[in-house]
Amino acid sequence: MSVKKICFAASSGGHYEQLMMLQPLMEEYNSFVVTEKTIYKSSVENKKMYYVSQVNRKEVSFIPRMILNLFKELYIFLKERPDVVITTGVLAIIPLCLFAKLFGKKLIYIESFAKVTSPTETGKLMYKFADRFYVQWGQMLEIYPDAVFLGGIY
């Protein structure tokens, strides 16, 4: 069995912070990170980093930025060829997740720690596509009955 290549992906802010809780796992595998470009430094020691545009669905620039991200993420995906994509969401990372499924790769989605009783919009979409879907609160199993609950990421 060959060593798997893993893409860890998240938008900026809290989603990225949650993803960083998986750093011990990142160190075990050939992996790289995809996140939004921000004014603050986001990096993981000894890991290749890729940056996509920040998106906000309420901004006028939403559609052009998503189109730009679509092409950036396709380039990243084809260049790196990950076997698995692990993500905490959200919007900016959706194209990467869909490319994983389109190319027959595994997709693992971790619903936000902040969502205790209601789903995220991205979570509702990814629940349909993810090979493994994790929730961080037991009560979220009522919303996502086929999800896996192992506790919080923190």
State what each model feature region is.
Residues 60-83, 102:
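An amphipathic, basic-hydrophobic alpha-helix
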Residues 14-27, 38:
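Short amphipathic alpha-helix
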